[in-house]
Structure formats: C-alpha cells, structure tokens
Amino acid sequence: MIKAGFDSKDLAKRGESLIRQASNRYLTTVRIAFRAKQRRFDDFDGLLEESSVKPVQRSIIELSDEQDQPDLLPG
C-alpha cells in the first residue's frame, strides 16, 4: 500500500492534484486533516502497522488514490 521510502516530489504532486481537482479547496484541506487525525489515533490504538510515514502524508496518498481510482471504493 504505502511504502516507507516514498518520493517527496510524488507526494507534492498528489497534494497539488487533490487541491487542483477540488471544487472547494478548504473542504479538501479539512478532509486531509480529518483523515490524518483518524490515522494518528489508529496508530495509537495499534490498528495500523508501524510506519515511518506521517499521518498527513499517509492521508494525502490515500485520498489521492481514492480520487485516481474510484472503482476501488466500496459501494
């Protein structure tokens, strides 16, 4: 899913893509922050494996993947 040695340029491109394709930049920023907060608490609860990727970085990658590959989402 998310590799520990990710490229910072790729992360920046993903973040820019999220903001660029958003109808509301503020809500996109809030979604990223909320997802990061969830991941942080999941890390504390031991629900996620130990990772060197910070929660904000992980949330940008996850939201970008969801945006680029909507067919992977349930429902």
Swiss-Prot record:
This is DNA-directed RNA polymerase subunit omega. It is an enzyme of class 2 (transferase). Belongs to the RNA polymerase subunit omega family. One of its GO terms (biological process) is DNA-templated transcription. One of its GO terms (molecular function) is DNA-directed RNA polymerase activity. Promotes RNA polymerase assembly. Latches the N- and C-terminal regions of the beta' subunit thereby facilitating its interaction with the beta and alpha subunits. Its EC number is 2.7.7.6. The keyword Nucleotidyltransferase applies. It comes from the Bacteria.
